[in-house]
């Protein structure tokens, strides 16, 4: 395997654990990245400890101001204008995945992954978000707006 490093969006939850196991079984060296969106020190500590228990490097990046501006303010504004906001979709396409890609680039890591349940299919030279194999856990709706350059970096979909 030529480039076997991957940066994993890592909350420390069960899906993050599953992603680590799947990636390692496929021969990848995993580095975990936890994004600090709300200043939840208990969540950050849990992620750090769990990454340590798995024996993988752990990094954290604060995106609090960006999250407040791009997700919380958007949600509030949309709600008060009588619109139906989609904060999770917006967070994934504007914060989580772009930050994961930028951090991977800064570290010289070519691949990114998360524990989200979805698949990527290719057609006509492009990659598309499609439903997960398990419809009960499918999260493709929250990821529909991921740009092509992010999909091109993405390795794994549970």
Q: PLM features: residue spans?
A:
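Conserved small/polar residues in nucleotide/adenosyl-binding loops
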Residues: 156-158
């Amino acid at each position: 395997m030529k480039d076997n490093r991957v940066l994993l969006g890592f909350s420390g939850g069960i899906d993050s654990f599953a992603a680590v196991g799947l990636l390692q079984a496929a021969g990848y060296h995993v580095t975990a990245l936890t994004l600090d969106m709300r200043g939840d020190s208990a969540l950050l500590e849990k992620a750090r400890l769990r990454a340590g228990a798995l024996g993988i490097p752990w990094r954290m990046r604060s995106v609090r101001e960006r999250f407040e501006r791009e997700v919380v303010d958007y949600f509030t504004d949309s709600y008060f204008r009588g619109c139906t906001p989609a904060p999770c979709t917006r967070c994934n396409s504007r914060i989580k995945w772009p930050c994961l890609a930028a951090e991977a680039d800064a570290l010289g890591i070519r691949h990114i992954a998360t524990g989200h349940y979805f698949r990527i299919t290719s057609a006509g030279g492009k990659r598309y978000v499609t439903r997960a194999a398990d419809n009960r856990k499918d999260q493709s709706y929250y990821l529909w707006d991921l740009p092509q350059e992010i999909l091109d970096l993405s390795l794994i979909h549970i």
